[in-house]
């Protein structure tokens, strides 16, 4: 069975963090460059606030764990998310050049990670900036590239890697989905063993972590 799905699921935010790390630019300056290159939308909120990655990890975790996971349940602890009716993820808008310098001094980089994991105590999912060092396979995933790491109890770790932002990668993904839907009308991606019952996630305070 699959116990964990995690990774860098948004090419826009990864491009921004990569440029802040390699070139020392501030968030706003790199965001403008990303928009000029077509990597970021004119309204980038869905990307930079983590909403896009949140929806993606909800889908991937649902498929991996065999139960429906509501993206609105992922890492919710602020009243603002309730008022806006949006998932309360931690995006990258508050990441500063100083944060990047501290990460470098610790031999790490900052990545916006989406994580879905199930344990003996229950399942949880979250999207937030994380400091990772070179021992992590996602450390060297830079620019507009995405990577998804899957951990299975039999296969161990496997990683899938590719471009996640830009006109051609986006168009390719959309067209592939349309073609798949047209070739297989009336079917879904949910296979045997799927349970539409909503999977309740562990509260934030029970999620293990370290600083």
Regions found by a protein language model. Give the residues of each.
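A contiguous active-site-proximal alpha/beta segment in oxidoreductase catalytic domains
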Residues: 1-18
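Structured core elements
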Residues: 4, 16, 111-112, 126, ...
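Short acidic, glycine/serine/threonine-rich loops at helix termini
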Residues: 17-21, 162, 172
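Substrate-binding/catalytic subdomain of NAD(P)-dependent oxidoreductase enzymes
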Residues: 20, 30-140, 145
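Active-site lining segments that contact anionic ligands and/or coordinate catalytic metals
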Residues: 122-124, 145-147, 155, 208-211
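Glycine-rich phosphate/pyrophosphate-binding beta-alpha loops
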Residues: 156-158, 162-168
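A conserved regulatory-domain signal marking ACT and ACT-like small-molecule sensing domains
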Residues: 173, 178-211
């Amino acid at each position: 069975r699959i116990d964990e799905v995690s990774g860098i699921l948004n090419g826009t935010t990864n491009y921004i963090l990569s440029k802040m790390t390699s070139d020392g630019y501030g968030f706003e300056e790199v965001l403008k460059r990303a928009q000029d290159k077509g990597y970021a939308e004119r309204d980038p909120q869905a990307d930079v606030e983590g909403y896009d990655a949140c929806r993606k990890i909800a889908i991937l975790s649902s498929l991996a764990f065999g139960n429906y996971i509501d993206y609105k349940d992922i890492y919710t602890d602020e009243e603002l998310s309730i008022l806006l009716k949006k998932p309360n993820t931690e995006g990258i808008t508050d990441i500063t050049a100083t944060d990047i310098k501290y990460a470098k001094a610790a031999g790490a980089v900052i990545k916006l990670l989406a994580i879905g994991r199930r344990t003996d105590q229950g399942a949880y999912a979250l999207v937030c900036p994380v400091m990772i060092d070179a021992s992590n396979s996602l450390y060297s995933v830079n620019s507009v590239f995405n990577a998804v790491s899957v951990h299975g109890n039999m296969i161990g770790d496997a990683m899938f890697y590719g471009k996640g932002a830009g006109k051609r990668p986006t168009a390719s993904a959309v067209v592939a989905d349309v073609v798949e839907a047209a070739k297989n009308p009336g079917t879904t991606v949910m296979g045997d063993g799927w349970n539409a019952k909503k999977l309740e996630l562990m509260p934030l305070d029970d999620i293990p972590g370290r600083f």
